[in-house]
């Protein structure tokens, strides 16, 4: 282990000088461990990551925790390898920080646990799986209109309080229950309170045992927020490559990854690019996203919450992310206000998998007809608001009649919300979803009341609900 000394501290950026011309490699982890000698000093156990080489013997590094108490001249040890984090079964049900240290007060990780470096190349071309396979989620609106691809990347857009977290939890639950799959949750620049709430909600709903969680909260230095997504990804890669699993990787929020990179870039002295972002924005995003893929062994499907600054979709941060996405799930506040959960906008959500050669001709035609019906209903809403239903043609009245039933049938109860609603959740296979909507479009259930379609699973449940309401079926 080669030793060096701190020669400069600039917030989260630390310069270290090594003797005898030794220069640690880029991305190497350096350790500073210092015991307080008097009451004016603090105990320090800090990890730095090498970012730049300055001359023959000096490196500029990014701190993974606060640099409070660092003094010039402190000893630094080169570990000779990048930051490495625990992987495998030991991570399930646990909460970690960027360095792979447990932060859930549930005890230490076994010393003999396998650890993998967080910086790794993306899978080679010949290792990639080429066939497109749909990931069934059991959530009707997603499976019908914006299906997820195994090994794909999904963007989840939504403001506060429209149900992003509940949708994420339900996806984790369904993948664990129906597919026996593993989930990894990476909280990037998260509010600590939200991360804490999510952890306890997952404990209560019983999905924590199939989940590993990694957090780099808002209050942490930019180095931690920039690398925590890679920590989560490394844990997910182990389950894909070594165990052949289909893994779900949640990143909340991918914008904070870019934001942290921008802060670090400025501190490293790089010339800023458009809108003040780092010049390496596309490269950093590509290095992360290219590792999220399907291989012949297994897949990592990622669902990324995306914050759009000032609702400007042309901002370089969201615009760079969009180019990597296979599907988008847009949550709409108006639908949440109507009590339609999940509040997924059926017209704004998209997926490249919604094509006849991938989902099949019947599924494709039903999905497109559902969207056409809802789009026509949307166009008619202004007329209805001003003149009322009576002024519509018979054809348009039928469109509205069916569109409202479709809109309500796109809602369903979630397993993870059962403790709040008192209603059991439903998992609906894709075939059942397509059949249900096809029959509604054919007018088979025009005689049933709208409320019978609200928050149910399969189409048979609509009939049962209508019977319970005293309607002749």
From Swiss-Prot:
Keyword check for ATP-binding: yes
E.C. number(s) listed in UniProt: 7.1.2.2
Bilayer topology term: Peripheral membrane protein
The keyword Calcium belongs to this UniProt entry's keyword annotation: no
SMART domains xrefs: AAA (SM00382)
Annotated SUPFAM superfamilies: C-terminal domain of alpha and beta subunits of F1 ATP synthase (SSF47917), N-terminal domain of alpha and beta subunits of F1 ATP synthase (SSF50615), P-loop containing nucleoside triphosphate hydrolases (SSF52540)
Key words of the record: ATP synthesis, ATP-binding, Cell membrane, CF(1), Hydrogen ion transport, Ion transport, Membrane, Nucleotide-binding, Translocase, Transport
Enzyme type, top EC level: translocase
MF term (GO), any: ATP hydrolysis activity
Substrates-to-products reaction catalysed: ATP + H2O + 4 H(+)(in) = ADP + phosphate + 5 H(+)(out)
Binding site for ATP: 158-165
Cellular component aspect of the GO annotation: plasma membrane; proton-transporting ATP synthase complex
Coiled coil start-end: none
Assembly and interaction partners: F-type ATPases have 2 components, CF(1) - the catalytic core - and CF(0) - the membrane proton channel. CF(1) has five subunits: alpha(3), beta(3), gamma(1), delta(1), epsilon(1). CF(0) has three main subunits: a(1), b(2) and c(9-12). The alpha and beta chains form an alternating ring which encloses part of the gamma chain. CF(1) is attached to CF(0) by a central stalk formed by the gamma and epsilon chains, while a peripheral stalk is formed by the delta and b chains.
Family, as annotated: Belongs to the ATPase alpha/beta chains family.
Function: Produces ATP from ADP in the presence of a proton gradient across the membrane. The catalytic sites are hosted primarily by the beta subunits.
Name of this protein: ATP synthase subunit beta
Species assigned in the record: Geobacillus kaustophilus (strain HTA426)
Gene giving rise to this polypeptide: atpD
């Amino acid at each position: 282990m080669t030793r060096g000394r701190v020669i400069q501290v600039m917030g989260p950026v630390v310069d270290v000088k090594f003797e005898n011309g030794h220069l640690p490699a880029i991305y190497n982890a350096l350790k500073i461990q210092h015991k307080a000698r008097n009451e004016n000093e603090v105990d320090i156990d800090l990890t730095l990551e090498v970012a730049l080489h300055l001359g023959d013997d000096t490196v500029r590094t990014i701190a993974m925790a606060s640099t409070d108490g660092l003094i010039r001249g402190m000893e630094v040890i080169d570990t000779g390898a990048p930051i490495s984090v625990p992987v495998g079964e030991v991570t399930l049900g646990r909460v970690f920080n960027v360095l792979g240290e447990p932060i859930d007060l549930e005890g230490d990780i076994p010393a003999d646990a396998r650890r993998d470096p967080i910086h790794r190349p993306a899978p080679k071309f010949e290792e990639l799986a080429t066939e497109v396979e749909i990931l069934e989620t059991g959530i009707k609106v997603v499976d019908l209109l914006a299906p997820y691809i195994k090994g794909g990347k999904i963007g989840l857009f939504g403001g506060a309080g429209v149900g992003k977290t509940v949708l994420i939890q339900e996806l984790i639950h369904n993948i664990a229950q129906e597919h026996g799959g593993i989930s990894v949750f990476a909280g990037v620049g998260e509010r600590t309170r939200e991360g804490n709430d999510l952890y306890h909600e997952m404990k209560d709903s019983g999905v924590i045992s199939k989940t590993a969680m990694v957090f780099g909260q808002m209050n942490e230095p930019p180095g931690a927020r920039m690398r925590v997504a890679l920590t989560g990804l490394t844990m997910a890669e182990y389950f894909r490559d070594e165990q052949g699993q289909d893994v779900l990787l949640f990143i909340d929020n991918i914008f904070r990854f870019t934001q942290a990179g921008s802060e670090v870039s400025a501190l490293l002295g790089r010339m800023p690019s458009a809108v003040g972002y780092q010049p390496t924005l596309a490269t950093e995003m590509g290095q992360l996203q290219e590792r999220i893929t399907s291989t012949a062994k297994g897949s990592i499907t990622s669902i990324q919450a995306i914050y759009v600054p000032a609702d400007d979709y042309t901002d370089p941060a969201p615009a760079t992310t969009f180019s990597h996405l296979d599907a988008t799930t847009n949550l709409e506040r108006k639908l949440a206000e109507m009590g339609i959960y999940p509040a997924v906008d059926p017209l704004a959500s998209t997926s490249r998998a919604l094509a006849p050669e991938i989902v099949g001709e019947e599924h494709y035609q039903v999905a497109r007809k559902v969207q056409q019906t809802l789009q026509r209903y949307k166009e008619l809403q202004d007329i209805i608001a001003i003149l009322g239903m009576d002024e519509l043609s018979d054809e348009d009245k039928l469109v509205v009649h069916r569109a409202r039933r479709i809109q309500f049938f796109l809602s369903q109860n979630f397993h993870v919300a059962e403790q709040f609603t008192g209603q059991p959740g439903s998992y609906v296979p894709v075939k059942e979803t397509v059949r249900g909507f096809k029959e509604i479009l054919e007018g088979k259930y025009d005689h049933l009341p709208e409320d019978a379609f609200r928050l149910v699973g399969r189409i048979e449940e609509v009939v049962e609900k209508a019977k319970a309401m005293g309607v002749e079926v």
